[in-house]
Amino acid sequence: MDGEDIPDFSSLKEETAYWKELSLKYKQSFQEARDELVEFQEGSRELEAELEAQLVQAEQRNRDLQADNQRLKYEVEALKEKLEHQYAQSYKQVSVLEDDLSQTRAIKEQLHKYVRELEQANDDLERAKRATIVSLEDFEQRLNQAIERNAFLESELDEKESLLVSVQRLKDEARDLRQELAVRERQQEVTRKSAPSSPTLDCEKMDSAVQASLSLPATPVGKGTENSFPSPKAIPNGFGTSPLTPSARISALNIVGDLLRKVGALESKLAACRNFAKDQASRKSYVPGSVNCGVMNSNGPECPRSGRATFFHKGAVNGFDPAPPPPGLGSSRPSSAPGMLPLSV
């Protein structure tokens, strides 16, 4: 009570609740202390009874021990007599054993000398063994290093061979792409020059040029994309087996992407030219009065242009306005024209 600080109360109800709670707390503490006192009294009575029983047992044990002590005193007297008799006999035996001990010590000294000689020989053998083990470990380490170096060189040789194969394949594919690109550029120039006069005839010439370009020696068409583009780690720089730097790899990928976009644009132009030729032929057969078409030679029909009869945008035919180029390598490109093999890039 004296050590506790009485808080300030704002109302009589709070003060009443505080003192009531405090009284209940002290009442509970009093009840617990009284219970502990009762338990302590019961335990002390039980302990007193137990101690009295132990005292009775200790007194009985003391009487038994006194009887045993008296009996043991008689036994000690008898053992003293036996000990004196044994001492006389043991003295005789000790004299005999001393003679034997002197002889045994002489033999022991001889054996100690022999053991020292054996230990020296053993030390020499252990030193030789340690030297042999060290030399064997050194030889084994050098042998393992040589094996690892040979394995590393073999892996480098295998990697170099695979890189040489990849370089040759990439060179072949680059040559094929350059040939196809040159053929399509010539094809585009011829089509652009002759489109206003005879688009159908130009398309047929373009088909023949593409077929001629396909007859050139190139890499097989059936190669998949997974064989055409090796991983960045496998692309050599053409002067050694060291991999490309990140900037060179990015520039190479940009060049390949530009080539793919150009090829897609050329294919879209070819498809537009073919569609234009087919539409002109269908319009000639179904709308004979709108366009005056006649057969000029055996290469194909020649249709004069008419401003009111065409259904195509002028720029899409003469300018070969291509479709938007693909955003990446994985995007879809317009399908090739009929009769043409798809490019393996």
UniProtKB/Swiss-Prot annotation:
Entry GO MF terms: alpha-tubulin binding; beta-tubulin binding; identical protein binding; microtubule binding; oligopeptidase activity; protein-containing complex binding
Region entry Interaction with YWHAE, spans: 189-256
Span list, region Interaction with KATNA1: 195-256
Residues the record lists as Phosphoserine modifications: 215, 231, 242, 344
Coiled coil location: 28-190
Segments of this protein annotated with the region Interaction with CENPF: 175-345
Phosphothreonine: residues carrying this PTM: 219, 245
Cell compartment(s), UniProt: Cytoplasm, Cytoskeleton; Cytoplasm, Cytoskeleton, Microtubule organizing center, Centrosome; Chromosome, Centromere, Kinetochore; Cytoplasm, Cytoskeleton, Spindle
Keywords in alphabetical order: Centromere, Chromosome, Coiled coil, Cytoplasm, Cytoskeleton, Developmental protein, Differentiation, Kinetochore, Lipoprotein, Microtubule, Neurogenesis, Palmitate, Phosphoprotein, Transport
Cellular component annotations (GO), alphabetically ordered: axon; axon cytoplasm; axon hillock; cell body; cell leading edge; central region of growth cone; centrosome; kinesin complex
Region entry Self-association, spans: 56-166
Region listing for Disordered, in residue ranges: 217-240, 314-345
Pfam families xrefs: NUDE_C (PF04880)
Subunit structure: Self-associates. Interacts with dynactin, tubulin gamma, KATNA1, KATNB1, microtubules, PCM1, PCNT, and YWHAE. Interacts directly with NEFL and indirectly with NEFH. Interacts (via C-terminus) with CENPF. Interacts with DISC1, dynein and PAFAH1B1. Interacts with ZNF365. Interacts with PLEKHM1 (via N- and C-terminus). Interacts with GTP-bound RAB9A; the interaction may lead to RAB9A-dynein motor tethering.
Protein purpose: Required for organization of the cellular microtubule array and microtubule anchoring at the centrosome. May regulate microtubule organization at least in part by targeting the microtubule severing protein KATNA1 to the centrosome. Also positively regulates the activity of the minus-end directed microtubule motor protein dynein. May enhance dynein-mediated microtubule sliding by targeting dynein to the microtubule plus ends.
The protein, known as: Nuclear distribution protein nudE-like 1
Species of provenance: Rattus norvegicus
Protein encoded by which gene: Ndel1
